[in-house]
Amino acid sequence: MSVRVDIGHRLGDFAVEARFESAGRLTALFGPSGSGKTTLINMIAGLIRPDKGCIEVEGRVLVDTDAGIFVPKHRRRIGMVFQDARLFPHMSVASNLRYGRWFTPAKERYADMDAVIDLLGIGPLLGRRPAKLSGGEKQRVAIGRALLASPGLLLMDEPLASLDEARKAEILPYIERLRDETKIPIVYVSHSVAEVARLASDVVMLAQGKVVASGPTEAVMQRLDLLPAEERGEGGAVLDTKVLRHDEAFGMTVLGSAAGEIRVPRLAMQTGAPVRVRIRARDVMIATEKPTGLSALNILPGTIVAISPGEGPAVEVGIDCNGATVLARITEQSRQALELRLGGNVFAVVKTVSFDRANTGAGLPLEVDG
């Protein structure tokens, strides 16, 4: 699964210059409003013709301005899901789904309708009209319609932006299933750190029409200096963990990560199941000696590998915990009082572990103190 983009385009006074390559299952285009995310995704879709450059999906050239190649949008085999579901109001859910297949030649169809219905959990909705659906249900149907076009690439332009938190919690698990159970590469537009940290395998961060960072999610999400101001407090470490064991005596689950063991309340998951967790920099304290007499359960030893200025009186400290970097945001006064320096051995005291319990028996975001 690969997507390669190297394009330039000007829209009035706004210019987009984007170059990135991703082989991840779900690539997030991330940045604040006005950073060029939607313009870029529209060029990939064929809705905007770039002034220069090339776009390739799975080795297939869609755009190459030097070679005079521009594949029209209806021949790109790209599925698209927008902020609003854009379902046909006079059609039932079943008819909306079938519409996705009408313009795909029979020999190019690979999507099975029953499998898509099962994947998205929309079987009970088939006889309804869009007016009788919730926002989350409409988006699931829109995703199903896009999948039934048998696309080679799925573009999702802020599909959760118009939903409240409850509806987001409803639909996120289905996007995760789509990412994990299909072989369709996904490009996902968002300005939410929580969404990107949960869903993305790779991130392309945009600002003022340019790519300012790209790479694996766990690396890019640590660039607190590049996050939108309103999202900076959500940045930090993203860790892919696995369930090691359950401590039934205390009702806890122990997760294994590169940074060390992390204890959280009991999860309804089997040993070995994957869990992605997020540790925000603002939720990490630093100790120069292993602390005692604390309620915090998650204390990770490490070495300081980075110290950089933050906003106002804050500094951001990167701690290498057995190969995984955990970030802490503390004050400069605290840094000086603790005499923190590069190479110093410290303990990261994690006050809160955040993750989404989509597959853990709940389905709502969870923040675990300690």
UniProtKB/Swiss-Prot annotation:
What protein does this entry describe? Molybdenum import ATP-binding protein ModC
Keywords associated with the record: ATP-binding, Cell inner membrane, Cell membrane, Membrane, Molybdenum, Nucleotide-binding, Translocase, Transport
Q: Does the keyword Transferase apply?
A: no
Record-stated family: Belongs to the ABC transporter superfamily. Molybdate importer (TC 3.A.1.8) family.
Q: Please write the reaction equations for the catalytic activity of this protein.
A: molybdate(out) + ATP + H2O = molybdate(in) + ADP + phosphate + H(+)
Physiological role: Part of the ABC transporter complex ModABC involved in molybdenum import. Responsible for energy coupling to the transport system.
First-listed, main subcellular location of the protein, grouped into a coarse class: membrane
The ABC transporter domain extends over 2-233
Organism from which the protein derives: Mesorhizobium japonicum (strain LMG 29417 / CECT 9101 / MAFF 303099) (Mesorhizobium loti (strain MAFF 303099))
Upper lineage ranks?
A: Bacteria, Pseudomonadati, Pseudomonadota, Alphaproteobacteria, Hyphomicrobiales
What is this enzyme's class at the first EC digit? translocase
Q: Name one GO molecular function term.
A: ABC-type molybdate transporter activity
Q: Provide the topology term for how it sits in the membrane.
A: Peripheral membrane protein
Q: Which GO terms describe its cellular component?
A: plasma membrane
